[in-house]
Amino acid sequence: MAQLLVLYHTPTDSVAFDRYYQETHIPIAQKIPRLRSYRISDGPVQALAGTAPYLVAILSFDSMADISAALASSEGQAAAADLRNFASGGATLLIYDSKSL
């Protein structure tokens, strides 16, 4: 399984971020093709060291090829472009392949 991990940094207005993320961004991101699951952190995120992100989103796909195709799609491009509309604190995006142990 391949993952897209999004670490959203603390926004300037958390109320506006939360509202926009729930009402606008999630519906946009859920349209990304080949998306198998979409999970987000629930409540405050704690870091064992360093600064904790404000919100964590994990989008799962069957393969790295599926992530590449999804991000290249019009829906993936729309979701990426939408970040500038609400992620005032910035975001770190990581993609990786995972395996169960």
Stretch-by-stretch model annotation:
Residues 1-101:
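Macromolecular interaction modules
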